[in-house]
Amino acid sequence: MQSRVVSSAVMFLGGIAGAVKSLPAFVTSSFGAIVDPEDGRGSAAFAEITALTALHHMQRLMMADEMGRSILKERPQVTDETLEFAKTQPEGTFGYRYAAFMKRNNFLPSGRAPILHVSDPTLAYVMLRYRQIHDFVHAYVGLGRTIEEELAVKLFEWQHTGLPVGLMAVLGGMPWLRMDQILNMGMYNEWARANAPRQLHGKRFVSCILNVPWEWYLDKPYEQLVDDVGIVPLDAFLKERKSGGLHDS
């Protein structure tokens, strides 16, 4: 646990230190990301400018996993055609769940911002992959697009990526929340930590979100994806938490 905290701190401080090299863009993007948590452009730019240390970490996570290596090699893209395919899937599939999330929020994959501040091609793809699977993650864990729900997802993604934008989004979003919603952040953090990536003997396997072939599961039952990935959706986590049935094995 202590090593994870140290590693997270290193990635956060490394990202901020690296951002100083692009000071004007950093100041502009960080102001937009913190003052308005719904400022997509500001958040996207801030995420990239502060990402370098975390991106190297994310690349290592992918290279250490067979599916992650395959994703880095093939470099799949989440496109509007991906969503169209998902729309054709029957109820009960992950594709149906993803398409429903996108419809509720009037989203298109093509609406995601391009990568503008990461020069290394491989790291740029890692950042793009993270950005493109964000809606898959929302659909998987069962969280919508309110500020409270978005911050919960950011806490979860922080555990999987170490990107500084996750913590900064939480700091920037807090003033927009009611007191009861602020108190919920502790619960969301508990859920996020319980679902951090791990492949330890005797412990519950949890895949890193970067190493999940989300597109492959679009025509598969949602339950199959949950079983394979090991991440406990929030509603299931809360039920287990209430019943005292949470465990790591």
Swiss-Prot record:
Pathway terms, separated by semicolons: Cofactor biosynthesis; ubiquinone biosynthesis
User: Which cellular compartments is it found in?
Assistant: Mitochondrion inner membrane
Binding-site residues for Zn(2+), renumbered to this chain = 134-135, 138, 150
* Principal EC category: lyase
> Does this UniProt record's set of keywords contain Zinc?
yes
InterPro entries per the record? Coq4, Coq4_euk
State its cofactor.
Zn(2+)
Q: Does the keyword Membrane apply?
A: yes
Question: Which domain of life does this protein belong to?
Answer: Eukaryota
**Keywords tagged on the record:** Lyase, Membrane, Metal-binding, Mitochondrion, Mitochondrion inner membrane, Ubiquinone biosynthesis, Zinc
Enzyme Commission code(s) on record: 4.1.1.130
- Provide the topology term for how it sits in the membrane: Peripheral membrane protein
* Catalytic reaction list: a 4-hydroxy-3-methoxy-5-(all-trans-polyprenyl)benzoate + H(+) = a 2-methoxy-6-(all-trans-polyprenyl)phenol + CO2
For biological process, the GO terms are: ubiquinone biosynthetic process
The record's Gene Ontology cellular component field reads: extrinsic component of mitochondrial inner membrane; kinetoplast; mitochondrion
Q: Which PANTHER family match?
A: UBIQUINONE BIOSYNTHESIS PROTEIN (PTHR12922), UBIQUINONE BIOSYNTHESIS PROTEIN COQ4 HOMOLOG, MITOCHONDRIAL (PTHR12922:SF7)
Q: How does it assemble?
A: Component of a multi-subunit COQ enzyme complex.
Q: Mention any additional remark.
A: This protein may be expected to contain an N-terminal transit peptide but none has been predicted.
What is the role of this chain? Lyase that catalyzes the C1-decarboxylation of 4-hydroxy-3-methoxy-5-(all-trans-polyprenyl)benzoic acid into 2-methoxy-6-(all-trans-polyprenyl)phenol during ubiquinone biosynthesis.
Q: Which HAMAP family match?
A: Coq4
Its family remark reads: Belongs to the COQ4 family.
Name of protein: Ubiquinone biosynthesis protein COQ4 homolog, mitochondrial
From which organism does this entry originate? Trypanosoma brucei brucei (strain 927/4 GUTat10.1)
